[in-house]
Amino acid sequence: MMALFELPQINNVRTKRNVIRALEKYKIMRVRLGERRMPKLTSTLTIVPPSFNNEFHSTTEESAIWNVDAVNEAKAYVKLIDHHINQLPERSRQVILTKFIEENSDYEAMLAIHVSHSQYKEEKRKAIERLAYQLNIVVEK
């Protein structure tokens, strides 16, 4: 009997790499939320005539706009990843948080979630796969 739906074979190495990149970006974006880009200060003063075509030429204005856009991008990305991590089953969420967010070793993560080595390896594989599917970053074979 043929199954109605079969999941495609995935490339575990490349999928894991994508998940790690997404989580690294997540951590960077969390840090970025506390930083601001400062306008450039120059030793010369130039007069820029007013523009009536809605273009900005001031570095202060450009920096302010960049700050707002960067903060909004960071907030959106952090919210997206938080949402998908929170949708994972409890054990998968524990693996992602202890191993990839807190950057513990496999051994430390295994001890933190109280499982055997073989259970940890299986849970880690499942957690990566689940998060990859949720983020739509799975690499198929």
From Swiss-Prot:
Listed SUPFAM superfamilies: Sigma3 and sigma4 domains of RNA polymerase sigma factors
InterPro entries given in the database record: ArpU-like, RNA_pol_sigma_r3/r4-like
Protein's UniProt name: Uncharacterized phage-related protein Lin1259/Lin1739
Protein's organism: Listeria innocua serovar 6a (strain ATCC BAA-680 / CLIP 11262)
UniProt lineage: Bacteria, Bacillati, Bacillota, Bacilli, Bacillales
